[in-house]
Amino acid sequence: MIIKKAFKEDLETAAYLFDLYRQFYDKRSDIESAKDFLSERMENHESEIFLAFSADDDLKNKGMGFVQLYPSFTSVGMKRIWILNDLFVHENFRKQGVAEALIARSKDLAIETNAKGIILETHFSNTAAQKLYDKIGFEKDDEHFYYYLKV
């Protein structure tokens, strides 16, 4: 498996996976908007996207999954933090260590940028993801509540 940072030349693969990810959350397919959204994130350096590719020659150009992280900061800790906002593995490649590899690369990014850590959220019902996060070493935050203001 090859994990690489996504650049403009990877936009088609990234958008394809991103569109499938959104469909997983019951959004309609919109590949052009997916391209626009990811292209803007890349151009403005607003996120880091990593793609997983198979090392198998027959599948070399087929994206297996992706992770997208957004930078933020902890004012109290006076350091960068990364928000692991999107993680998706194509159904044909699940249970093959793809998610673990993408999270490992995310952890490397946090270390490279001297970040305090990585935060994420997941739905209460997503027990498969919760098991993975626990296995990798993420800890549930039991000190804070998170609120959302719809505008």
Over which residues does each language-model region extend?
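Conserved acetyl-CoA binding element of GNAT-fold acetyltransferases
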Residues: 79-91
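Conserved GNAT-fold acetyl-CoA-binding loop/helix
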Residues: 18-40
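Conserved acetyl-CoA-binding loop-helix of GNAT-fold acetyltransferases
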Residues: 89, 95-108, 131, 135
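A short beta-loop-alpha structural element at the N-terminal edge
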Residues: 1-16
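Conserved GNAT acetyl-CoA-binding A-motif
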Residues: 110-121
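A short helix-loop-beta-strand connector motif used in the catalytic cores of GNAT acetyltransferases and
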Residues: 39-51, 83
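Conserved active-site alpha-helix within GNAT-family acetyltransferase domains
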Residues: 100, 124-143, 149
